[in-house]
Amino acid sequence: MNIKIQGGGSGTYANTGSCTGVTTYLQHEDLERMKNGREVQPFFNNSRDYISAQEVTFKIDNNKAKLSRNDAKFYVITVSPSSRELEKMGKTEKEQAEAMRRYVRDDVMQHYAEGFGKGLNKEDIEYYGKIHFERKGADRYDMHAHIIVSRKDRSNTRKLSPKTNHTGKKNCGNVKGGFDRTDFFRKCETSFDKCTGYDRAPEQTFDYLNTMKNGSPKEIFQKKEWAERVNHERLEKMKAEWSRDLQEPHQEQGREEIQQQGNSISQVPEINQAPQRRSNRRKNSTSPGKEAGGLEWYVNYR
């Protein structure tokens, strides 16, 4: 899962003025999809699935009380699942788009709100998402989402900057508390794995990749050791499961054989050994099925 927080500069995500440029850019694949008869994904927010670009621009541009001319007015969060993660989100475009909206609403934006340490929930954030299916320059199908987030909360009273580093202190200059991006990325990854059942390899985790990029030599070595240990434990667990799966058919076959033998035994005729004396036979009779002394054995079948 690749999640980025963008905004600033003079390019597509320039954010000190109107968000018109961003909303226009985020509609770039709509016309092509309509030409091909494919469904277009509209903007959405926490409670609505269909929002026009005009409304998005109006709401973001007018939610900037007490922001100066050069202050950021909004940010853009990009959520890009890998191909394997997409498979866990659904089999069709429609299923995956619905899963992405749920993930953005229930997890990404909730973790975003919590990241400021101000007791906020996703309902307090002014945001609008847009789902895309193809990245520029990519030939293959590749779904991802862009989320325009206002610098101010929905009440237009609190400044929220995800670019302000978290220090653990209550007051950090003009912005209280800052934003813990590392914790945000980690929580988004964990909640995705939990809600989709995705079995993430240790080398694919945010902590591992972040350490490989930014960690010290000692931290990198320790993280590699951790990944090797986790992979070894997973392999041993898989071996145990394979061994159990191989044994179960033989155990089942043995139980069936025992059951069959039990059924056969229950059908064996019972021999009634109670002798009956035949007074009209001679003592030394040698007729078949008869014993000397006038005793004859009868077999009774149940």
Regions of interest found by a model, annotated:
Residues M1-R302:
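N-terminal nicking endonuclease/strand-transfer module with a His-rich metal-binding environment
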